[in-house]
Curated annotation (Swiss-Prot):
Main location: host cell
Membrane topology: Single-pass membrane protein
Taxonomic superkingdom: Viruses
Spans traversing the lipid bilayer: 191-211
Protein name: Uncharacterized protein 55
Keywords: Host membrane, Membrane, Transmembrane, Transmembrane helix
Compartments, record wording: Host membrane
Protein's organism: Sulfolobus islandicus filamentous virus (isolate Iceland/Hveragerdi)
GO CC terms: host cell membrane; membrane
Amino acid sequence: MKVKVRSYFTISVEDRTKRLHNTLSAEYIYLIQGLLTQGQSYKAPYSGYTVAFTPPSNMYFVFLSNGVVVARFPAKLLSYNENINTVNASQCQNNLTSCNLNNLLFSLEYSSTDETNDTYTFDEVQLWADNEYMIAYASVGTTTKNVNTFVRVTWDAIVTIESDNVLYIPGCTDFSLMLNLQLQLNNYQPYLCLNLPYIIVALTLVPYSLVPQNTFLYTQLSTLLKILNISSTQQLQLQGVQYYVVGNTVYPISQPYIIINTQQPNTITLFLLYGINNNYFIYTTSLSVTIQYFKLYIPTLTINMVEQ
């Protein structure tokens, strides 16, 4: 699976404007990869520490000079748009492929303006989610705000999520559509129209309170909260991939699968379940895997972050 991000900062000081292609922070890249696989308590590869994720309540722009913070402003969401090929549930079947999308795209823009009489010089701009994690940064060159001038900063991004026929990205909106498969697992949720990859990625960039209510994302999030019987995204516990299913048997993701009977076919079909608040949701399409006899096998999921 791929998550592609094309994003820019635009800095305006009086009549001078710079538009700069930014860099995603290593922390944010690891965060996305971790949330989509292990959940919100994951070991950050760059430090080895386990980092907890809480969906943000606010976004901020931060200006720095030689690495020292000189200004910080709340970011206002100016726009949020989606390009999702939503389909009527009547076109879907009770399986993991009929309503699956190859990709989906959303775009957003944040902005803030400093019209105070403050004076400062900065050479870098960053976008932060609360004080939890930096999303992106860019070097802007030495820039000075004087008493009678203003600074305006925007950050715009286009995010594309590609399933690569691995992650289940449904395009339907009828939440009564369920996978017709009974599993011996408490709190198994067989919803076929819940879009977990989109929910997880979008939550890192947009506080729930800012999501426009006429969007596909808002419907997805509000439905998830209702299923879990909670009232805010801050109560979400993203637990990552917890189980895999072969046939109608559920295995913990930490438990290897093995075939010791050489008369048995060694190609299996499986799908993964993602845990949220101890509920377990369909996360991938049906995957066909050929494994070696007598060799332990554990499903893995690779998430590629691509800066465009």
